[in-house]
Amino acid sequence: MKIRNEIKALYDMLVRIRRDLHQMPETGFDTFNTMAYVVNSIPIAADAYDGFSGVFYLPGKNTACIAFRCELDGLPVKEENLFSYASENKAMHACGHDAHMAIMICTLHYFIQHPFEYSLLFIFQPAEESGGGAKHMI
């Protein structure tokens, strides 16, 4: 599989963001620090932001829109790993939400630099694990 050099260039950022987010999991709707990290990682303003969730929109040449969604929340379990980037609080990203966020942030970076023909919507949703987050985003 051939991977574009522009995508490869985002690899170090992807790893750094994933590890940063892995260290700071939050649960349910209490994702204020996580969402602040997301907002500070993206060089454009959020189109909707309430402190614990957010939406970024990139207009395209076409009226059709493709939406991407990722989860912000972790689980209320203590991490027992000894990684240098292990969780620093009593929660854990055990389901990959830290990776989903990192991938989505880097995808957004890519499309800011390489506009797409369709409009793109990036949805950062809280409370996927505990429920209610999707309804909040709608």
What are these regions (language model features)?
Residues 95-97:
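Membrane-interface loop-to-helix entry segments
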Residues 99-138:
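Acidic/histidine-rich catalytic neighborhood of metal-dependent amide-processing enzymes
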Residues 2-93, 102-105, 109-118:
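Acidic/His- and Gly-rich active-site-bordering loop/insert found
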